[in-house]
Amino acid sequence: KKMANGFHDIQSLFCLVDLSDKIYIKKIYNKKTDEISFRGPFSKMVKKNENSIKKILRIMRQKNMIFNYYSIKVIKNIPVFSGFGGGTSNAATILKHLINKKIKKKTIEEFTNKIGSDLRLFFISKGF
């Protein structure tokens, strides 16, 4: 069943795995646009025009959480659309890095509704 927020009403079990993309972030000083690039074995499958990184940056600017622009390079080691949460974990990593402080639960929930329901998983401080 699809809910009002566009997500499906499901229950999921999560298992954290030792698999990760590599993300390089640099502040851009003379441009008013982000430069996002993808490399690696799974880079060709990433939607360049609309992806979790573009979404998280756009939302952060709408909420006045960031004011700079960034060059972001992602080495895609996590298969795209595989269910491993690669895009969502990248968004969470960028959010944590750029904010560089504890993020309120309410803020995480707001981002979860726009990025993906598994986003909150990447803010859990303890393993299972």
Task: List the model feature ranges, each with a label.
Residues 1-15, 101-128:
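ATP-dependent small-molecule kinase catalytic core of the GHMP/sugar-kinase superfamily
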Residues 1-82, 100-102:
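ATP-binding N-lobe of GHMP and related small-molecule kinases
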Residues 78, 88, 127:
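Short, flexible active-site-adjacent loop segments at beta-strand->alpha-helix junctions, enriched
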Residues 82-108:
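DPxDG-like acidic metal-binding loop motif
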